[in-house]
Amino acid sequence: MGDCSIFTYTDNDFIGKVCCSGQQNRGRSRFDIALRSGWTEKRNTGLFRYRLDELETRILPGSRGYIAQLNIMRGTERRKPQEILSVRQNFDPKQFNFNKINPKELLFELKRESERKCSVIINVSPLEFGHCLLVPEPEKCFPQVLTHLAVQTGIETVLLSADPGFRVGFNSLGGFASVNHLHLHGYYLNHRLKIESSPAKLVLPNLNLYELVDFPSGFLFYTQGPNLDLVVKAICSLTDVLVDHNIAHNLFLTRGCPPQMEPDTSSSRNGVRVIVWPRLSCFGAKEESAFNVALCELAGHLPFKNRQDYESATEETVQDIIQKYLLPQEETAQLKEHLMKCL
């Protein structure tokens, strides 16, 4: 991928205390400064497919607090998605992959002491400020299937940020991933999401695996670091089962509250919530609609592609769209039963 700066970090760089104060000028970590300044420089030099300024945003009335944003250019200017036929589809070197990008799109290499590197590159069709792609060991050409390193890097980047608005996510093949080359998304969203504090019940104590009580139901893991090995293994054991059964899925990683049965109204966001949503697969070329149901939409962040849908959207219409992509209740029950037997 060419020469670039290397961002080296240790556990000492993790930010332990984060508070959702609602203020624009929060304290910034070394990671935030590197990402925000590098991303802004790339934007100013015209490397993006369109210029992303402040997006028109509205919070939909209702209990879910959906964050709707109008991002017409992303809907029209982004790279055409690859055709996906299976959650376990092999990497194809003939297709676009992140070894083929313009070297100027590379922000820096992320490297934990004495461990493997992860390339941090700009998403040239950004959905929000700071939108980047985390690509673990791109030269190894991993397909879009989560690995231990990918999950660990995702959690650690959230811990490296002092901004509770920094989010990380993953779309599996069949879950609206656009490129079959292992990558995660990272971006800043300066709005609180219900998912940060929504209630959850414990379903598998040996894995500290919880289930979200509210719509859309998904599996929840929680960690405050720095010892991440157990939670990373638990997450991978779940996603491995989904891949083995060809079940598409989306992940969302965000600062959040410890899981409990009652919603947490405090502003403390010291840990990381990792939510895994098994979902119906969408194979073949992507369908175009008001919005694709993927990692950020399931978390309550809705980038709309056209003004008409943006202005007419209600909590009810959004839930109806999302519901169509969730596993039916019977399949969800069968999956939970299988997980309890094999994990």
Swiss-Prot record:
GO terms for cellular component: cytoplasm. InterPro entries: GDPGP. One of its GO terms (biological process) is glucose metabolic process. Keywords: Cytoplasm, Guanine-nucleotide releasing factor, Hydrolase, Nucleotide-binding, Nucleotidyltransferase, Transferase. Its EC number is 2.7.7.78. It is found in: Cytoplasm. GO terms for molecular function: GDP-D-glucose phosphorylase activity; guanyl-nucleotide exchange factor activity; hydrolase activity; nucleotide binding. The active site is at H183. Belongs to the GDPGP1 family. PANTHER family: GDP-D-GLUCOSE PHOSPHORYLASE 1. Specific and highly efficient GDP-D-glucose phosphorylase regulating the levels of GDP-D-glucose in cells. This is GDP-D-glucose phosphorylase 1.
